[in-house]
Amino acid sequence: MSHTIEITEPVERSAQRERQGFHELDRKAVALTMGGVLIAIFMGSLDQTIVATALPTIAKSLHAFGSYSAVVTAYLIASTVALPIGGKLSDVYGRKRFLIGGMAWFVVASALCGLAQTMTQLIFFRALKGLGTGVMQAAANTTIADLYPPIRRGRSIGMVAMISIVANIVGPLLGGYLTDGPGWRYIFLINVPVGLVGCIVVARFFPPIRRPAVKNFKIDYLGSLSMVGGVVPILWALQKVGDGDRWLSCGIAIPIGLGILFIATFIAVERRVEHPIVPMHMFRNSIISISLLNSGLSMAALFGVTIFVPLFLQAVLHASARESGQILLPFSITIALIATATGHLVGCLGRYRTLALGGAAIAVGGAYLLAHMSPDTSRMALLSNTVITGFGLAMIMPIYNLTVQNAAHLTVLGVATSMVYFVRYVSSSIGVAVYGTILTTHTKSAGLASALNSVYWVIAGLLVTVFVATMFLREIPLRRSNVEDQAALE
């Protein structure tokens, strides 16, 4: 007997689905494809953290201490740029070929990184790897939307959040183990067999999913180039600010000014071309706009907590690096579990706004408590404050993936999904740069503990903004099939 995912709907609706090219998907194919998707997401998330602990050893091995931070920067910039382009092209040419292509590119680039003989080669190969990661992540996260209708998608998005958190926890540990054991090259080479398995699974079991046809499509080369010209200098400058450079120095102000000019050009181009990389009309949908705003602010807040809680522990409470890791572990586990549970709950309720408001309120409360810490704060109090903040963030972040996909027209589903991650990457870079500036400025005048409190107040302010914006978030029922209801989406 064939096992299929059944969607209860009227006969005329079923007929409409057939006319539009949508059909029931085989359960086994969906489950195995989802396994391949999770492999892709795990590899992409792991690669962001596994390198960190190996960087000093890599720099020593390749005799290039002065430029080793570029190994991270090149990867981040390339993956950010590739996200919207990969999302758009997957909307037009299909998710399967871009998921497999992105994974294959990632695997080849990983092998090249593992074989690099100079730091220049490694930086170049890391940039290539970032391009593959961006395409892979855009296609993988949108494939979930193709496999599951919004009413069933919450559980899968929760699983993705859990996989990402697990990768972030495992990454530094695995990176240290491989670096101290077989050698730093294996932090890249380990991706090769895992990625090949993912490619084979997706190639073999990806179900036949038709998509709305895009007639006479032409690649928006001018839009793509102007977007790259805008994103690259801005992200590069933000990374330099995070390393301690001044905002008003020529090396920062000029790239940011140039990037803003290119972004303005990009927006003007996208408004005029027939097939834009990022359709500007998409942002007229208030659900998408508010969800993207909140997604970016939430990620900036999460990065702030992840980076500056360990600093408070070690520099103010005089904890060891090991103790800092032990305190952050419950925070990470909380996020993984609550994100998964939230995905299940949204699917059961078919609603999201109340949960998002509740999560934002909890996160604001946790950040408020963090902002009131002092050298007399106990480690247990810091742990509880951090876990409370993580609990709230874990409730809201998966929701905004779902709200964007639920509100997006099927013809721009890949672009809309990729924009969630694009906004998160850019927001986290801006957040780290701003936090670093606050820390540097306030430490000179008031000391480190007070400066960290100022950072936490900024994080609390971001989360208050998320709460207020969520109050204006229009709630529409989660669709029960991947057939568009045009009236609901406009």
Model-derived segments and their meaning:
Residues 32-46, 51-53, 66, 72-74, ...:
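12-transmembrane solute porter fold
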